[in-house]
Amino acid sequence: MKKKWVIRLLWLLVLAVAAIIFWFSSQNGEDSTNTSSGFISFLLRLLVPGFEDKTNKEKKLILSQLHFYVRKGAHFTEYAMLGASLRLLFHVLNLRRPILWAWIAGTLYACTDELHQMRVDSRIAMWQDVGIDSAGVLVGALLVTLWLWHRRKRKRT
């Protein structure tokens, strides 16, 4: 009974992460840019002393320089979360080669995400994002694998 509860919870986690990714992909180009810019501004105010004292022109320049990297980092991170949750689910389901299945499922979701973005106003599909997303899935799955291995190793000693 406990295992069924864990499986349901992990399915819910996978679906929640997929829904968050879908929500971000559903934002039109302007909203997506505003979300990214707001996040970057928040981080800069938090981490860079004197950022608030810069002129608006200097702030915009810094934002534009970081925008690409933050967006790609967000892609990688959200898909790492998907890969980690898929890997945990497949572990509990006792699938053979759970890393491979997590990577395949996450990469297929990344492909459908790019197709979805083609249908959103002022958004385009960028197929190199699938590569970034796929790498994120793999890293997330590998991190969970390392955690499970470490946990199992500690139980033996």
Model regions and ranges:
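"…centered on the first transmembrane helix and the immediately adjacent amphipathic helix/loop
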Residues: 1-77
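Membrane-helix interface segments
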Residues: 6-9, 93-103, 123-127
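Lipid-exposed faces of alpha-helical membrane segments in multi-pass integral membrane proteins
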Residues: 9-23, 104-112, 135, 139, ...
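Membrane-interface loop-to-helix entry segments
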Residues: 68-82, 127-135
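Hydrophobic transmembrane alpha-helices
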Residues: 83, 87, 91, 137-149
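Interfacial helix-loop-helix junctions of multi-pass membrane proteins
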Residues: 111-132
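Short, charged juxtamembrane terminal tails flanking transmembrane helices
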Residues: 154-157
